[in-house]
């Protein structure tokens, strides 16, 4: 299957690259099918709608940048995503890419959870958590005066 993408041009996909989101993503409920497109030689992955090329999100696995990040999935989410064990799950967070890039932030409050075996996913909005929608990817640097 060939699709037009926002960042990669036209790409050929295998079924293994596709992920179904039963309810879409918040704000994009009509977008149900996405492709995971890793950016080679980088920690970034693009979550690309297969229907609309302009609907694409830059994501990372959070643990490299936020080593203490952890979440607990509720039973309903585990059931919906058919999660049996921890290694069924790939966890990503969506970035807001800024200029300069050092001002880029990660949404730790709403991770994207994917069952890698079933190829189904959901963006989970966490409540009662210290995480916010904008955590700096890179610590602020203090400039010399």
Swiss-Prot record:
GO cellular component terms given for this protein: cytoplasm
GO terms for biological process, alphabetical? bacterial-type flagellum assembly; regulation of translation
List localization entries: Cytoplasm
Q: What's this protein's function?
A: Acts as an anti-CsrA protein, binds CsrA and prevents it from repressing translation of its target genes, one of which is flagellin. Binds to flagellin and participates in the assembly of the flagellum.
Assembly and interactions?
Interacts with translational regulator CsrA and flagellin(s).
PANTHER family found in the cross-reference section: FLAGELLAR ASSEMBLY FACTOR FLIW (PTHR39190:SF1)
List the HAMAP family.
Answer: FliW
What is the name listed in the Swiss-Prot or TrEMBL entry for this protein? Flagellar assembly factor FliW
What is the primary gene name for this protein? fliW
